[in-house]
Amino acid sequence: MTELPTVENLINGEWLRSDHERTVHHKFTGAPLATSYDATPAMVTNAVTVARAASRTPLNPLQRYEILRGVADQIAANREELALDVARESGFSIKDCLGDTDRAVQTMLTSAEEAKRIDGEVVPIQAAPGFAHRLAFTIRTPVGVVGAITPFNSPLNTVAHKVGPALAAGNAVIVKPSPFTPIAAAALCRMLLDAGLPPGLIGLVLGPGDPVGQALVDDERVDFITFTGSTAAGKAISARLGMRRATMECGNVSATIVCQDADVLSAAQQCARGAFRKSGQVCTSVQRLYIHADILDEFLDELSAAASKLVLGDPEDPSTDIGPMISEAAAKRAEEWVHAAVDQGARIVTGGDRQGPVMTPTILVDVAPDARLLCEEAFAPVVSVVPFNDLEAVIDKVNDTPYGLQAGIFTRDLDTALTAAKTLRMGGVVINSTSSTRADLMPYGGVKDSGYGTEGPRYAIRDMTEERLILMEPAGGSK
């Protein structure tokens, strides 16, 4: 029997195993991919101790730039191999995984560039009474140790979004990836070491949120937590942090509005992609579609046609558009939500079938307003289509949720677009594209139960640094 590759914890440059091992499976075939080793509480404590010591001597901005640039080059050079690893451990199509790998290159490049641009500002202190001879300015300093907790649905690029800005800001960082998808995270950590990062500045601890993530959060020597995951987990983490700072990128029930004047074909094709890419397992996947009643039938025809063209299957097959969900349990839950909606009066336009962990792209209409598919994050390839007539009323519907990450609107009318931009209570409003649209350098974060803080290297660096005022008086005192 061939021995499986191993995924081990990284502490102070050493790869470490524990007595608690788990198998990482291919999400489509179920075949074992690797053996990973959960970190013990002592390992987490040791990782923080090492990171704390290393953070006291941060790299200078040029060193940070050169290391992060080197990692970007390594990702690009190993693009196909990394994408294949991600496809196997996540179940996402190789098309999507190649795209995510390319995005990780850009995330690291942007982080590298931003490492050279961390600036402060001059404070006009001389305008204050009694301060005419003083000088004041601000600088930004690293927070110290960053704990990065990442989900399964972007195993490489989300880790890059945590690690890149944290290191660019001059911090040490400890990564705790999803136990479903640790392979890409370990590969990125290895690349950082190969690029010359001092070993104490990067750590990797493996295992589930309880107890591994919890141990990382509870250690008060961790100065900052950056988390992507469910709202429930985000709230639990926030409650444990006390006065320590964090970025929380949590759930959403993402909506996109298609107005009467929209390009129906373009909107439908984009919405199909936004709803079903990665089997709908993205925080901004289109889950609620509000379509003007005058174009509803035409839009449904085009959306169904776009969905029918999507190829389901093995994520390693280049022709596959949609692979399995992260687990059969996740697919069963999605199937149950669809059946519950049908029991409440919804009608399935297309899809609704499940085979193991693979859920077919599903479109529903006549969904009850209190159905879970309209009220909670499905995280599945399921979209509910709801007609509307009045813009103000539909904006109220989109806002009538505890969440607020991103929303999209399709319209040719500038006034309509600006009205939506001003009144949709979201972290981002995307005009003439879907809620799932993202560029890695843009600010990305939500409001309400979708979290707080902002991703995107430039913005994450501001969160991961502290502003410090420097106030100077001439050595001889005021003249």
List where the protein language model places each region.
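Hydrophobic face of amphipathic alpha-helices that form TPR/SEL1-like repeat modules
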Residues: M1-K27, P32, P124
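Residue-level signal for inorganic ion chemistry
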Residues: G30, R64, V86, M108, ...
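Glycine-rich loop-to-alpha-helix module at the N-terminal edge of alpha/beta enzyme cores
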Residues: G30-D119
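Conserved C-terminal structural/oligomerization subdomain of aldehyde/semialdehyde dehydrogenase
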Residues: A31-T35, R221-V222, I257, V311, ...
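Short, well-ordered beta-strand elements within core beta-sheets of diverse protein domains
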Residues: P32-A39, R52-T57, G147-A148, T256-C259, ...
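Rossmann-like NAD(P) dinucleotide-binding subdomain of oxidoreductase/dehydrogenase enzymes
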Residues: V123-S266, F388
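A short hydrophobic/small-residue beta-strand
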Residues: A172-I174, I348, G428
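ALDH superfamily catalytic-core signature
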Residues: F224, A232-A368, E392, I431, ...
